[in-house]
C-alpha cells in the first residue's frame, strides 16, 4: 500500500486538492467554497474528517465487522494508551455507557474534569433509573461529600492513606515512617474517644495532641477507676517528671494525668505510645512530623475542606455524604472530578485515598460477599472502575487493587498517554511492571514514543511474507570459437522473508479514533471507535449544565 505505485490509492485526488487550495486563496468566503465545504453525498470534494494519521492500514480490509469482547475478560483489567487528543476520553465515554446500560456499578475517575463525560454519565444513569453521585473538587457547592479516610477495615489504613502521600525517597522515608506512627497513634486515640477520622479531625488532633491525650486519659480513668478525681487532687507528680513536663513545653494537666495512670499501674500500649509522644520536646517533635502539616493544611483549607471532611451532625448542609458501600448497595453510577489542574497534590491525595478505600472494601467483599452485615442475601455485583489520566492518580494503593480485587468483581480500565508517565509517577520501574503485568487487555491509539508502541509490538509474533525479486543478466561468451556472441536471462525469484507484524511507526501514525487492540489472550484487532449518539431530548439539571458550560 505504501509503495510509490499506490500513491493514487492513498493521496487525495487533484480535484480535491484544487478545492482545498481555492478555499485557502479565497478565505472560504465565496459561493464556490461554501459548496465545496459541504459534507453531503453529492459533493465529491467534501473535506475529509480531521483525524490525521495514515488511514491506509484500516483500509486494507474493506469489510468491517463489530468487535466483541468476552465479559469474562473484563476482570483481567484493561489499559488504554494514546497521546493527547486522539480519543481516549471518548473511548472511555463509550465503554462507560455500555457498563451503565449493562447494570454494572460504574465509577469514573476524571482528574481533568471532562464536562461531556460527566454529562453523559448523568444522562445514562437517568435513562437506566440508577442513582447518580457526582463528587467534584472543582465545584464543591454542587458536589456530594466524601470522607476518604472515614471507612476502613483496619484502623492502620488511615495512617497508611495519609502517609503514602508524603515523599518517600532517600531520607524522607524515615520521616514518612515517623509520620505514619504518629497518625496511627492519633487515629487509635480518636477511635477510643468515638471521634470519626477525617482530615480536619486528624489535623486538629495533630496540632493539639496534648488535649487529645488528656481526654483519652480521662476516659480510661472513668472506665477503670471510678471516682479517680479525689485521688487525683491529692496526687503529686514525681519531681523529675514535673521538670520534664516544663522542659518539653507540654500541658501540665495532661502530663499529670499520664503520671497518675502510671501510678495506678494501668498498662496499655496506646497509653504508652501517647506517653512517648508527650515525652518529646514539643518543638523537636513538630520538626519530625513537619512534612505532615503542609499536606493537611491543603486538605483542610477552603470549601474543599467541608467536602472531604464532612460534618455528619450539620443538618443544614443538603449535600449527601457518599461512601462506597452505599454506592454498591444501591447499584449507583459515580463520577469523580478531581480538578487536578487546580491543585494536583490535593487531587492525588483524594484519588489515592479513594483507591485505598475501594481496595479495603474489595477485601471485605472477597471474604463476606456484598451486603455484609445486612439481613438477607445480596446478589454479587460487578464494579467497573475507569481511571482517566491514571498516571496522575497512581500510587502504592493501586497495585493491590489490580492484583487481588478481580475476585471481588472489580474490573478496572485505566487510560494514560505513555507508560513512562506511570514509571515517573510511581518512581519505580519494578512497581510499574507490576501494574502492567495485571492489565491483560491493551488498546493502543496513536502514541508518540517508541517505548510505548513497543509495549504492543513486542507482544506480536513475526510473520513470513512472500517476496518477489526480478533478476536480469547478460554477458559475453567466454569461448572465441563459439557461434554465440553473448548470453542473457531474466528470472522472477519468489522467496519468504520474516518481518514484524507491526512496527512502532504504524502506531505513531494512527488516525484519531483508531487503535490496535490485544484482547482475549493477545488476539490482535485493528479497530475504529464508535461515538455515542446524543439524544436531543436529554434533560440536564441546571447545576450540571452550569458545570459543563
Predicted regions mapped to residue ranges:
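Conserved ATP-driven motor cores of ASCE-family P-loop NTPases powering translocation/secretion/packaging/pilus
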Residues: 152, 402-404, 408-520
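A residue-identity detector for tryptophan
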Residues: 31, 41-42, 68, 133, ...
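Phosphate-binding and hydrolysis-coupling loops of NTP-dependent motor/remodeling domains
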Residues: 2-31, 470, 500-533
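P-loop NTPase motor domains
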Residues: 61-63, 69-86, 90-410, 505-526, ...
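N-terminal start-of-chain detector that recognizes signal peptides
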Residues: 50-54, 78-81, 105-107, 304-309, ...
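Basic- and hydrophobic-enriched, low-structure N-terminal and domain-boundary segments
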Residues: 1-86, 90-95, 141-143, 396, ...
